[in-house]
Amino acid sequence: MKGTAPARRGMLEGTSNPAKGESMTDQETPERAHVTADDIEAANDLIDFIEACPSMFHTAATIMAELDEAGFTYLPENAAWDIEPGGRYYTQRNTSSVIAFKVGEDLAATWGEDGVAGDYHFQLTASHSDSPTFKVKAVPELDGAGETLRLNTEAYGGMIDYTWFDRPLALAGRVLVREGDRIESRLLATEREVAIIPSLAIHMNRGVNEGFAPNRAVDLCPLISAGELKQGDFDALIADEFDVEPEQILGRDLFLVNRQDARIWGWADEFIST
């Protein structure tokens, strides 16, 4: 998981004003008056949510936990649903998608006494639980130059390829683990960066500043070892994360993650970068 965002996130109290030699809050600084304390609080809440959700599986788990806390009732998709007026419910699919809904209080007025739809309406809001990234393939390793080892990945979603270069990257997603006669779906988010997609030195790619169209199958496969790891070691490393044997790992959906701390920035703290 990502670490706590830097102190700048909460830069409300004690803002220095060199011109007046005094300390102010955002509300008292004229050039920053449009960014309020409520704005900063909402931005920090958003940052906390994003950092808790490095994969679609973490996003679904986070949302379901918040729905439970808010009093929503979970409805298994494969069971009969008993819906009551005024009820609040949610269901999930594949542990990566969540659907939550509220039911009106007066259903008789909505449908009418004769069961014919009357003033029936609903409001719908939808959002992605995932984001563009690189997914680790079923065969996870590729031999690189010399003794190096690369991660065998495929593009997931529409992304701007060049933004992935030269960033230390972690792994996040879900892993299916056999425990006795059960199969458990477990979340994984490495606490450290384990891969990087390196740029070539400019003397090896003189035209890089004139237009570079990287080959995803060649240029965008991350480096994961300078010689310590060999073919077949990746699944053993994942097993170590759960303190299980490699043969207990039955499947995985793992993605590259940028663990750089999210932050609020700008002269008026009006931007968020994640």
Where do the PLM segments sit?
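Short intrinsically disordered, low-complexity coil segments enriched in acidic
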Residues: 1-7
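Basic polycationic patches enriched in arginine
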Residues: 8-9, 32
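N-terminal hydrophobic/helix-forming segments and targeting peptides
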Residues: 3, 17-274
